[in-house]
Amino acid sequence: MKVIEGVVATPNARVAIAIARFNNFINDSLLQGAIDALKRIGQVADDNITVVWVPGAYELPLTARVLANTGKYDAVIALGTVIRGGTAHFEYVAGEASSGLGSVSLNTEIPVAFGVLTTESIEQAIERAGTKAGNKGAEAALTALEMINVIKAIKA
């Protein structure tokens, strides 16, 4: 029986991080968590990490697709925060970001790690950006690295 499992140490990986400016006081923590995980755990060189800032979470899928289609990156990490408010805006933005990023990954065969927080409150977002609930940016980075290796192993 052949079993394929990915590892996270990927020193030669080329990774793009697409990050939303909206709610940047939370997203900055996600970014720091992602970069720390890429460098410290994944052993990715600083020169192999590209950060692209976009206005909000809604713009992440298009940006991820353009990055994936360049052929310059082994994975894309999407980071952002969508917090529920008093209108239906949350459902539209969160839904489009989620389905759009999944579509990019399926259509390009480049891993797109989902590091977009979708929370009910600012407090929940802060918890998921490095306090009680860990750092979802770091988790997304580790997912991206593991998927790079899984896909390489499948195609080998």
UniProtKB/Swiss-Prot annotation:
It catalyses: (2S)-2-hydroxy-3-oxobutyl phosphate + 5-amino-6-(D-ribitylamino)uracil = 6,7-dimethyl-8-(1-D-ribityl)lumazine + phosphate + 2 H2O + H(+). The keyword Transferase applies. GO terms for biological process: riboflavin biosynthetic process. Keywords: Riboflavin biosynthesis, Transferase. (2S)-2-hydroxy-3-oxobutyl phosphate binds at residues 86-87, 128. One of its GO terms (molecular function) is 6,7-dimethyl-8-ribityllumazine synthase activity. The active site is at 89 (proton donor). Disulfide bonds: none annotated. It comes from the Bacteria. Forms an icosahedral capsid composed of 60 subunits, arranged as a dodecamer of pentamers. PANTHER family: 6,7-DIMETHYL-8-RIBITYLLUMAZINE SYNTHASE, 6,7-DIMETHYL-8-RIBITYLLUMAZINE SYNTHASE DMRL SYNTHASE LUMAZINE SYNTHASE. Catalyzes the formation of 6,7-dimethyl-8-ribityllumazine by condensation of 5-amino-6-(D-ribitylamino)uracil with 3,4-dihydroxy-2-butanone 4-phosphate. This is the penultimate step in the biosynthesis of riboflavin. This is 6,7-dimethyl-8-ribityllumazine synthase. It comes from Serratia proteamaculans (strain 568).
